């Protein structure tokens, strides 16, 4: 769908790249105030997981999450689809099934027509329909910049919850979507994106991570998270810190969007990349400039990052193949050693 309005001109950030940096977020969330503890809350924010999980009895957990951001593309319908797909992904990343969503909309009503906002909502509704859920309501405010996202509710068998803090030594790492979304969308804004690469990032961002529901059945997947605004290294460092392991990443094996290296060489690097490295670069071993700029690239609606025990690798690859995805191990986890960085990157 084409539009005369370029939504990205009305926002200072783009997609998950407009997230508050991990370093600043740590300051915001740190509190000396005594926390209210609820024994039924199985997953909270202690390990920066993708969603909260609450035990409602009978072996069932309710998953609750929210995600919203400013436009990463100009087309309002695509913006709505991408934002909704990204929000729903958190449910899949926990191994859950989404059941309902409500919309979050901020709109500069003095700058952008309400008809454009309607197209954004329609895009969000389309993504919800593809996920098999209803967009049941929402809340809107007059805001200086366009913002859209969802609060999503899901369900999960509490014995099958996948967390980012339970990875085991010896697990192999897999990523279900290629990296470079931030790079390609930046290239498009700069007018440098080649015609043959038009739409690739949008297609990737709009692909639901439904296979997370199937991965929930695999006991050998010891940790799972989705890769979004903090980049691959940021989310992998959360797995390592929460699980007490360290990782070795093989850069050549990491899936990448077409020609992403050449776009990086042309300066198509979003601002979030530097903020990410500033926040967790001290946890990473030596890298080349190319490795740093791609592995810290903020992803919007990125893929699932899995830690898989060797005996479950064939089953995981078969599940992915049923969803049209060929998986290759991109690294492995080992025992965390004192004084060592959490992640080593090699060629």
Swiss-Prot record:
Site (Important for catalytic activity): 19
Residue numbers binding ATP: 19, 47-49, 67, 90, 138-140
GO molecular function annotations of the record: ATP binding; magnesium ion binding; selenide, water dikinase activity
Record's cofactor remark: Binds 1 Mg(2+) ion per monomer.
One GO BP: selenocysteine biosynthetic process
Catalytic activity annotation: hydrogenselenide + ATP + H2O = selenophosphate + AMP + phosphate + 2 H(+)
GO CC terms of this entry: cytoplasm
Role according to the record: Synthesizes selenophosphate from selenide and ATP.
Protein's UniProt name: Selenide, water dikinase
């Amino acid at each position: 769908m084409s539009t005369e309005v370029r939504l990205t001109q009305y926002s200072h950030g783009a997609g998950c790249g407009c997230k508050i940096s991990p370093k600043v977020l740590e300051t915001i969330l740190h509190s000396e105030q005594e926390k209210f503890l609820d024994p039924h809350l199985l997953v909270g924010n202690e390990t920066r997981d993708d969603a909260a999980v609450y035990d409602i009895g009978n072996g069932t957990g309710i998953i609750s999450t929210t995600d919203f951001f400013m436009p990463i593309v100009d087309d309002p319908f695509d913006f709505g689809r991408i934002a909704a797909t990204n929000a729903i992904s958190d449910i899949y990343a926990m191994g859950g099934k989404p059941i309902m969503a409500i919309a979050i909309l901020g709109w500069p009503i003095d700058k952008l027509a309400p008809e454009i906002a309607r197209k954004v909502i329609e895009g969000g509704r389309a993504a919800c329909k593809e996920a098999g859920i209803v967009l049941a309501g929402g809340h809107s405010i007059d805001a200086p910049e366009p913002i859209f996202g969802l609060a999503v509710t899901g369900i999960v068998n509490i014995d099958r919850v996948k967390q980012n803090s339970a990875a085991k030594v010896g697990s192999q790492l897999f990523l279900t979507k290629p990296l470079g979304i931030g790079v390609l969308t930046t290239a498009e804004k700069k007018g440098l994106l080649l015609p043959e690469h038009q739409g690739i990032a949008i297609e990737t961002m709009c692909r639901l991570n439904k296979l997370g529901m199937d991965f929930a059945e695999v006991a050998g997947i010891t940790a799972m998270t989705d890769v979004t605004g903090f980049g691959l290294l940021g989310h992998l460092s959360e797995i390592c810190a929460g699980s007490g392991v360290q990782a070795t990443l093989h850069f050549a094996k990491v899936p990448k969007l077409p020609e992403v290296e050449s776009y990086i060489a042309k300066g198509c690097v979003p601002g979030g990349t530097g903020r990410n490295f500033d926040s967790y670069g001290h946890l990473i071993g030596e890298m080349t400039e190319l490795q740093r700029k791609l592995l810290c690239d903020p992803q919007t609606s990125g893929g699932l990052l899995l830690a898989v025990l060797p005996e479950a690798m064939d089953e995981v690859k078969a599940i992915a193949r049923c969803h049209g995805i060929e998986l290759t191990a991109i690294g492995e986890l080992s025992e965390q050693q004192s004084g060592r960085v959490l992640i080593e990157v090699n060629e």
